[in-house]
Amino acid sequence: MMSAREAKNSTHQTPRLTNMSSSRELPLEAAVGFSGSVANGFHLHPDGKRRVYPLGDTIVVAPLPQPSRSKDVQEDPGDRASATFLHGHAGEITALTISKYGRFIASAERVSSGIADVIVWEEDVAVKSTYKEVRRLSLHTSHVVALAFSEDEKSLASVGGETDERVIMWDVHSGTALCGSPIPSGGKVCAVAFLHRSNTTFITAGEFVVSKWSYDDTNKRLSHDSLNLGTLKRHILSIAIDEDDDYAYLGTSSADILIVFLPQSVLKESFTLKRHISQGVHSLTLARNALLVGAGDGSLTLLSRRAKSGKILEFICCRDISRSGLTSIAVARTAQSDVTGLVYPKGCKTQYAKRKFVHFARLALSQDTAQPEHYRDNSETFDVYCGSERGELCKIEYCARHPLSGQCMLHSPVNRLETSHGYGITGITFPHDDGRYFATGGGPEIRVWETETLSSRSRIVVTPRTLNCLCISFMSDDETLLTGWDDGKIRAYDRGSTRLLFVAANAHERVTAVQGLCGTSGVISGGSEGNLRLWKVQNLNVITLEASMKEHRSKINAIALFNDDRSAVTASDDGSCVVWDVDRRARKVSFLGSTYFKALSIHPGERQIVTAGTDRKITWWDPADASVIRVIDDTKDSELVALDISRPDGASLAIAASDRRVRLYGYESAEVTHMSSIHASSITAVAFAPDGRRLLTASADGSVRVWSNPARVFADLGLEKELHIRRLTGEFDETDLPSVDVGSRVHMSRPA
């Protein structure tokens, strides 16, 4: 690294633009969470082994996770290393669908201006685990809200958003638009679905409008007929069409299900669920003999399609699945087993024993001393996967016909297979010397994750749930979690047991930054009022205030400590950064800028400090005299919200901006080397692993992404090469080179 004096002489206050066009894509290694706001965005692959879902501008094709035995902790999230990430969109994905046999995936996006592409991906014949882009359909502007494949995989229907307001039918194999038509006036369209027995007829529905579209291949014309709903005015959010194309089920925002008889295009029945659910019907999926309804309140409702009352639908049960709305429901296409009949215990081998078992089973069910799921017919049992708006993935079992009662039902319990943070993440942190796990904080929740598998190992929820965790960090023992809250308290927890160790009440108006001093002896914290305070910790159970320092006039956004803990740096919204003498409890130097400083980091060499803020400038400072070493401007018109410097070499600088992308800079060159794909929501925190091989990003939707650091990967490869050469030449000495943990090296993910 160049010295501070050399850097000042060469680049002092000389703004320069980084070369964004030459940057490569930052390789995504793994991710937790998905874009739950995309309607019907979660899909099961027809092979029954994989799932397909959107994550920002990326499509993830990953193995199905296995259920956990704990409500809050997932055991086996699936083999994340074998997940495939499909990149190609310039904006956030807003619609996703998969064809019946899994050959094609179609995805669409939202862009701020210009053409919103629809991309068709085809399964790679040579590598079945991945897809490749085969068609890019570019006719819609700004936004695409819904997509649907025909049953034979030959046709694709797409619906544009409010600024586009067009319905277009495509030929999947040639990529040409067969025909397009404006959306009928009277409301926006939210959903589309093809009829099962036709590749030229589909249904669209939305705000006060339901239309049946037909494509005339002879005249090359797309025409529509409005379905007669009588006097009903409903905002329709979801569509499901039965196997015989007789009925279309339309889920509404008013918790009603409209049943349309398709041959005559008339409303047959209106089935209300207002007594059981709230916030509308967000998703509908057909299952054998039943209709599954996902509601905005997070509940799953089972309706029988074999009603005995003469009606088309009959209410069976309603189960709470998630804390947020169910936007996707996917049902396994095959039952859990092809062996029909009641599953008997191993001891029931004779007909008498089986009849006796059935008799006592029915008696237990009638007296409520047993649950229906204790008696199973696996040939009638299907797995139902529910995706929520907050990115949770849950599984529940559906029985199409119970072997004793003959009714359809939902089995207990609900298995939470995978979950994002659950609330918007405000902070992410690694232990000082251990990259095996990390912690996130946001809302009333704190989670500790395993880095390799991205599985949640522990969860802490603070009451009341209206509280918000604003900052989080590990103390130097790597076991104690420090958290700052909007009620003005500092709370410390044991990482393993989640036990509350100590609380500093009234520490600040709102605790916005917190760090632990060496040896778990103290804590330094910053608040929304601008005070910096030092705390003494005794035996990890008592905390007392030692000093309070006031230099900032506004919120302190970040605190960074030097290695000896005798100096600290703070960044504030008042446009100043202050270097503090912790021993003397006094300011050493300060540097000012016309910005809100949002983030800072100290280079491992401790001769430079890097700051970023709302003025889009990245600034290198000398902590000795607060002089500017280098300033660069981000070329995009977006505020900088988070940064971190890789350790231990300090070769890479990660910057997160309000455009929802992370840019990786070479520290010495100040050039952008890699840039991430777009996140589904705003990025709130970035953190390098202690070994510098991974970069973690967290966002406001609760998702976490793990990126490989290419600079560190290539450095390890170079070190291995040098080691190999010295072995061959006989010059190898174990004391000459640092050891390289080859097994822990991050491998760049295979391109889609």
Name every feature range the model reports, one short phrase each.
Residues 60-61, 119, 166-168, 211, ...:
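WD40 beta-propeller blade core
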Residues 51, 105, 156, 201-202, ...:
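Hydrophobic beta-strand positions that form the internal "hydrophobic ladder"
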Residues 35, 680-682, 690, 702-752:
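Terminal intrinsically disordered, low-complexity extensions flanking WD-repeat/beta-propeller proteins
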Residues 65, 123-126, 172-175, 216-218, ...:
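Short loop/turn segments that connect beta-strands within beta-propeller blades
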Residues 21-37, 78-83, 131, 410-414:
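A short helix->beta-strand "capping" segment at the edge of beta-propeller domains
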Residues 43-47, 98-102, 148-153, 193-199, ...:
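Loop/turn segments within WD40 beta-propeller blades
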Residues 55, 108-114, 159-163, 205-207, ...:
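Conserved strand-to-loop turn within each blade of WD40 beta-propeller repeats
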Residues 33-36, 87-93, 138-144, 182-189, ...:
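WD40/WD-repeat beta-propeller blade N-cap
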